Amino acid sequence: MEVIEIKGIPLASRQPVVLAIGKFDGLHLGHQAILRAALGGVRQSEVKNSSGESVQLSVMTFWPHPLWALLHKPGYERMLTPPLEQTRVLHEMGVQRLFRVHFTPEYANITAEDFVFTHLPRMGVMQVVVGVDFSFGRGGKAGPEDLRGLCEKIGIPVQIVPPVAMAGEKVSSSHIRNLLAEGQVKEAAVLLGRPYTIVGQVISGRSLGRQMGFPTANLADSGSYVLPVAGVYGVEVQVDGGKERWLGAFNLGSRPTVHGHGLQAEVHLLNFAGDLYGHDLRVSFLTRIRDEQKFSGVVELKRQIERDVEEVRRLDRSKNG
């Protein structure tokens, strides 16, 4: 997949594309519906395309999150799918070209007319696909129907995709953020269509887990991922993006029993032997085991960790049969 960074007016391209536009934070089921509609547009456009070049499925997205770039809204400095993770997932979903807009107050000041009449034609756009909540132009005052009306003037059709609902509630990134803030990782996975995943590099720690018989990998917090609420989770882990997966017990919190400080993340992998220091771990959240707790001492903490690990083993047994 080709990634094109946009910091102003896009460079001119003759490559024809069907363009899905949105923040796509999380790439949840609603976003996936937009991408499926865009893929349908690609197939239709290939029939009509007279240039001889294949039409590419393309996405335009924005980074950092507009709510952070413009308002510094707390929490939105982190994303459900930061740029690297978003790129990986979009590639897996079959997107061929990604236009990533560096979203700034200056970019936000572009008028709706400039966006449609200047930007889109330079990107080789044959069709645009957006969701019903899409907004654009100065102050975000223009919506999907405004986009359709402007694009009609230059012969670009616009498809507006209705929202996806689960249990009577619209699937949205903000809803998923709220679920993670409550530790409801199973429910978040339903809306995402996959487990919620973060990536972190293993850093050195105090080796307290190893002293208790449960060696853990301590993960650096890059500050880019939305994190679930503190607690203990059953997770699945890949090392350096490899295909092999290990179940693990993941702890996120301040480790009050051993006088920890600040938010720390660590994971104990079941049936793993090896040195993980310096490696990147992809951690997918499967279930929440318990809240963070302060115990009377290390002995009680060790007993609880044993119970946590046994809970993860039960996950393995239920998964395999």
For the regions a language model picked out, list residue spans one by one.
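N-terminal Rossmann-like or analogous alpha/beta NTP/dinucleotide-binding catalytic cores
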Residues: 66-132, 136-154
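N-terminal catalytic cores of NTP/NDP-binding nucleotidyl/phosphoryl-transfer enzymes
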Residues: 10-77, 82
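Residue-level signal for inorganic ion chemistry
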Residues: 28, 90, 128, 188, ...
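Glycine-rich, Lys/Arg-enriched anion-binding loops that position phosphate/diphosphate groups
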Residues: 149-253
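Short acidic-hydrophobic, aromatic-tinged amphipathic segments that line or gate anion-handling sites
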Residues: 2-9
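Phosphate/ribose-recognition catalytic cores of enzymes acting on nucleotide-derived substrates
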Residues: 205-321
